[in-house]
């Protein structure tokens, strides 16, 4: 009898130990699964940050605000647009030339301590088109002008290359330039063409320029007389013809990708 009881006690002990061991294994598996889930969630968040796209806000007329993937803020030709649109602190301010409708820097009251301002003077230093690399963006000055209102020696356009390789061409105030055909080799993502037809090229010439530049997307801007107080005219914008055309209303935002 004692022997039988000893056998039963041994069996119960083994069963109990096995049960405890199984529970430990389950706990370990559960902990491993939780760690894996947390790692996957963290990786997903990092991927989302890595794939965050820059945005472009069309302020109207020739004025644009770009917010990079790093949350750096670039203003180009400040003039048109609500004051609220100029609220984000500037990291970089670009001006294509000195006409009043491209240099209202006072609209940008909020600037980071290391904010830089590049006007046509810096962009054309030494009579050469300059390139500036800020890490979050590379800015290349290119030709602009070629009409009686805009001297090619006093005006520039810009090509902005963002991290990730997205490129944005801003014609500035100009007519057709000798450099435009060569820009096709750059395979630009976005190209903005002025088309007011008063001081610069009209929509027909701007459409021809878009055919020369061959950007993935071409966008009309600077389409009215600055003195009119109207800084977007859809009827003019729709006369601009180009492959991959995008029409941005004043105050409309575009994700750059």
Language model: regions and residue ranges:
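Cap/insert and terminal regions of metallo-dependent hydrolase folds
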Residues: 176-256
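Bacterial signal peptide processing site
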Residues: 21-24
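Positively charged n-region of N-terminal signal peptides that target proteins for export
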Residues: 1-8
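Active-site metal-binding motif and surrounding structural segment of the metallo-beta-lactamase
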Residues: 74-75, 80-126, 185-192
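Divalent metal-coordination and catalytic microenvironments
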Residues: 66, 97, 139, 173, ...
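C-terminal motif of bacterial Sec signal peptides marking the signal peptidase cleavage site
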Residues: 16-19
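Core dinuclear metal-dependent hydrolase active-site scaffold
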Residues: 28-32, 37-88, 123-186, 201, ...
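A short helix->loop->beta-strand "cap" motif at the edges of active sites that frequently abuts
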Residues: 72, 111-116, 214-217, 242-243
